[in-house]
Amino acid sequence: MNIEIREYRNEDRDEWMRVHAIILSLSHAWNYTIQERPEYEGYTSTRLVAVALENGQSRIVGLTDVQYDNTTGELCFLKDSRGGYVLELGRLPEYKGLGIGKMLIDAAAEDAAGKGFHRLEYWTQDRTAQRFYRRLKMKEIGRHYRFRIKPTPEISALLMQDRVGAEYVYCACLPDEWPLVKQKYDIIQKHPLEPHLCVGFEIRF
């Protein structure tokens, strides 16, 4: 079996969506499902797929998408230069151990450099992905908690002034603030809305 990294094509859409859905179901990296393939209108982007070639047949088994800053700090956390924010990275579980993730990261970096960008940011709340990035010696650049709270009476009253109801409020805070936040607010703990620690990593090239 050979693995090839190539650019995404429009005819890949249905297969890409299927692979993305499988990866999403096994990861905590995403907060929502999607029914349309992201296009990144108005932005420079990288869209790559990993294709397995077996017995004369080919199938998409991994993917990565990068969206690039139009202006410094527009998308990326670090503000020293324009970079790429990696929105998608994953591979099918049955292809574990073949180095596909590293191949996609390397190919994305090469494509980014060809477009004039020299750094990529990888943010994830999935612990397996965090361990993977650490094994690759990526530099950690930040962390924060992502969580949902039940609206306080004050928040509910403010929104109801415009006849807006809120089932929950999606929030973020720094780790140092997390203990106080847990004491002060009614945080939703039940899956799939439970809190996660999101960690950011960076590569430069």
What are these regions, as identified by a protein language model?
Residues N2-M17:
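A short beta-loop-alpha structural element at the N-terminal edge
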Residues H20-L53, L63-D65, N70-E74:
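Active-site rim helix/loop that mediates acceptor-substrate recognition in acyltransferases
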Residues G56-L63, G84:
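Glycine-rich phosphate/pyrophosphate-binding loop shared by adenosine-nucleotide-utilizing enzymes
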Residues L75-P93, W123:
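Conserved acetyl-CoA binding element of GNAT-fold acetyltransferases
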Residues R91, G97-E110, R135:
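Conserved acetyl-CoA-binding loop-helix of GNAT-fold acetyltransferases
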Residues A112-Q125:
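Conserved GNAT acetyl-CoA-binding A-motif
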Residues W123, K139-P192, L197:
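Conserved catalytic-core motifs of GNAT/GCN5-like acyltransferases
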